[in-house]
Amino acid sequence: MADQTLSFPPSEAGKLGPYLTPTRAHRAPALPFVTLTFATSLDSALSLAPGTRTALSGPQSKAMTHYLRSRHDAICVGVGTAIADDPGLNCRLQGVDTAQQPRPIVVDPRLRWEFTRESKVLQLVRAGRGLAPFIITADRTPPSSQRALLEEHGGKYVFLAHDSLTKQRFKWDNMLRAIAAEGLQSIMIEGGGDIINSLLEPESCHLIDSVILTIAPTWLGQGGVVVSPPRRLGSLGEPIPAARLTDTTWIPLGEDVVLCGRLASQT
């Protein structure tokens, strides 16, 4: 648990500033500001295989991720990431105290995440270096021991109805409204693949305010977890691109490149 404190140069932080403020005057106050951010390989992969933790970010882009966490009220991952990575879901940026830590959000429709007192996120709470997670689930009967452990650390379950009984998923606008109702006005969506791809689907991608991607100079090869949302169809039923970024900025960070942008309007 001796995680190194990180620093991020103000000169680089300034380049990210335009993508960290609200950009749409018609944004409903019931929805938080949403930043989609993740690290990807040159072949759009997040990891070598499902359930396999894969480090992609170099030291400078890793520090950038923690700077971004310091600028958001919450960070969101799916249950697969929580199980595979045992993530800390905190901000290690120098000078960030407990009150400035982002709230972890774990999307776990069927309560698959069997966290324990030794889970890293809860260890960090006890060390005063992070906050306990809010777990979004459709299962209204969590084990009493899990619930007690979570609430002991300051976390809780947030209950939400499924979008579909077959997909076992939530509608993104419902999730974001539930998050905003907890007083969280901005959120980073960090992964994993199912979470990212579902957010980029046509019915939900309009909810994204900014996109900040780290591109690592490596190919992971076939069989990895990839970011590849469904294609859209044009007026004649022809396939058209799923989404495109506009207002882009490219920022070299060590051997990585960071791409910032906003989703172009879909017509």
Language-model segments: residues:
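Enzymes that bind and transform nitrogen-containing heteroaromatic metabolites
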Residues: 1-267
